């Protein structure tokens, strides 16, 4: 018997485009359910969801789609990712605080990092887009997290807030994420970098901080 051909990431992305950019939210949710069922959460995020969202932004910036289409696609994806956030958290797991820098509204990559960390047994406090550094610092003083992940698409956003990030780094480990996380700005902020794909970045953080083996073993069975 011939093994059925698997749908490629490109084909999944085309299906999302055909539904969401035609304002078919129900169809878009159906495609997303199929994507996650076939690929699993992490591969779906890395190979379909995040690349598709990047393409949506590119098409909006070139005028290929309108604001309404971009909003529908973004809102459907945000609602689906929000459902996944927190799944798998363990009461004894380490805590991560996640936030975008002031002025940064691109949060989907950070949401993906939060999802993967929670699936690895972490507890997460997700502050989201455009978080003032004073609020980030207050949250860290209150919760005393094992790690802080901050995201920005421009290195200047990190550099402008470097003094505040250095103060936070005195009591916890800070990890810079997204394209703005250059080596130079990480050094300036007394932080490390989560280089590359948000899913891989979450796994790197998980492994580098020496999470107890029991959590790693149980999380991989999810």
Region spans (language model):
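Peripheral docking tails and interdomain loops at the edges
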Residues: 179-222
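Hydrophobic/aromatic beta-strand patches that form the interior of the parallel beta-sheet core
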Residues: 97, 175, 192-194
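CheY-like receiver
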Residues: 31, 139-142, 204, 208
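Short beta-strand elements of ligand-binding domains
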Residues: 172-180
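Conserved mid-sequence domains
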Residues: 79-173
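Long amphipathic alpha-helical segments
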Residues: 1-88
